[in-house]
Amino acid sequence: MEITLGTRTADTVRIYFEKSQHPEIQKFLPQKAQSVEEALEDYEKTLLPNATSYGRTILADGHYVGDIWSYCIDPEDEPNCMVSFCIFETSYRSKGIATTALNMFLALIREKYGVNTVGAFTFSHNHASLNVLQKNGFSIIEEFEEDGVLSKYLQFSY
């Protein structure tokens, strides 16, 4: 299976927003945008020259299966950012797609922004996300409870 990263568009943002409303995704991935309009506004901000977030689509054999993005990009003193990802097409999960996509995306954001470290938050019960992050060299830095849910902060250094 060929995994590639594609360009996000207003259409893919709409698709992603719709797919991310599924209860199974909602329990693993908190959503910032509460409406498709808000998601599109956030996307428009990523197109600005001084954007602090950047995303790509995840394609498996040309089929749009998920998204990956960095946010809180800080290229200054100690260049760093955060990363998040989601495979919304359930039939494409557990096939190594997210692992490959994250590996590609880490190289891309290093080249594009010169970051030295990348952080990620995930719920402690999200074993699939933890596996993807750890397979890509992320280490658990902290475990904490927020709103009654155990979460982990992981970090990757180049």
Language-model features and meaning:
Residues M1-K27, S53-Y158:
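Acyl-donor (CoA/ACP) binding surface of acyl/acetyltransferases
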Residues E24-E44:
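Conserved GNAT-fold acetyl-CoA-binding loop/helix
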Residues T46-T52:
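Short loop/turn motifs at secondary-structure junctions and domain boundaries
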